[in-house]
Amino acid sequence: MSKSYQNTIPLFLEEKQLRKHINKIKTNLLEPGEPKNPDDSTVFQIFRAFASVEKSDQMRKDFADGIAWGEAKYRLFELVNSELEEPRERYFELLANPQKVEKLLQQGAEKARSDSKNLMKSLRHAVGLRSLD
């Protein structure tokens, strides 16, 4: 999939849009019941990225048994949607609260400064660069 071809699936799409993007995935013309090669299928490749080994193995078997493309896309949508539901909610929560994002960034910066200050102090001591105070 390529962004320049406008065939990407942004991770934090709302459910309806996510379904629409998944349904647009190009597939070959093999009919239901005809064995399909999962290694040549974008649907399977994306499914495998989100699924457990067991689910991937089952889907691979279903491809060999000739799963219909509509069913394969439906299963892909269900899996991706369930995996991204919580992160999507968090994403929209953060988008709606820029003050919260700023606060989190400031807290992270303070922690990083504190950690790096202690590290730099020990590094200077280790290489013999001591304060002139």
Residues of each region from the PLM?
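Conserved nucleotide- and phosphate/pyrophosphate-binding catalytic cores
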Residues: 1-133
